[in-house]
Amino acid sequence: IKKVKREISKDSFWALKDISFNVKKGEAVGLVGKNGCGKSTMLKTIAGVLTPTMGTVKVNGTVAPMIELGAGFDPELTARENIFLNGAILGYPQEMLKERFDEIIDFAELKDFVDVPVKNFSSGMTTRLGFSIATIYTPDILIVDEILAVGDFAFQKKCEKRIGDMLNSGTTLLLVSH
C-alpha cells in the first residue's frame, strides 16, 4: 500500500489519507480501531472492491475477501446456486466447486438447506456459507472484516482452526476488529 487516499464524498471527507504499509507473504495483520476510522474501506480497497482516489495498491496473489455479510450472494438463489455464483466471483473454477461441493456444505453445516433461497437464511447461516466458499481453496491472501462475530461459538472455533491451517500453509491474513 502506498500513499492511499479514499475520498468518501466531494465534501473532502477522506476515509483514508496517506496510508502506506507493506505486508509480507504469510503474515497475519490485524487492523484495529474505532467505528468509522477506515478499516473496512482499507480492506475493500485491498480486495479491489473500491479503487483509491489517489495512490496505489499492489496485491500479489489470489484474494479471498470476507468483507460484508452476504456480499456476492443473490438472495433469491439457493445455497447451491450461490456456491457457484460466489465461487465464480472469487475466480474459482467451476469444476473445483463441483468436486468440493459437499465439503463446502458440510463445513457450513447447511446440508438440510442446500436448496433453500439464501434470503431465508439467518445471518449466521449466511456467514457460514460465505466463509466456507471463500476458504475452500487456500488463497494467497484472506481478508476477514469482523463478519465472524455473527457466527456461533462452535463455528467461530472451526473458522479459527481453518484460518490457522491456512496461515501454516503460507496464506497472508488481513483481519479487522474493534
Give the label of every model feature segment.
Residues 1-18:
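Pre-NBD coupling/linker segments of ABC/ABC-like ATPases
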Residues 1-2, 84, 96-113:
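Conserved ABC ATPase "signature" region
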Residues 32-34:
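The feature captures the beta-strand-to-loop junction immediately N-terminal to the Walker
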Residues 47:
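Helix-to-loop junction immediately C-terminal to a conserved catalytic motif
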Residues 132-144, 150:
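A short, proline-enriched helix->beta-strand linker immediately N-terminal to the Walker B motif
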Residues 156-169:
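Helical segment within the ABC ATPase nucleotide-binding domain
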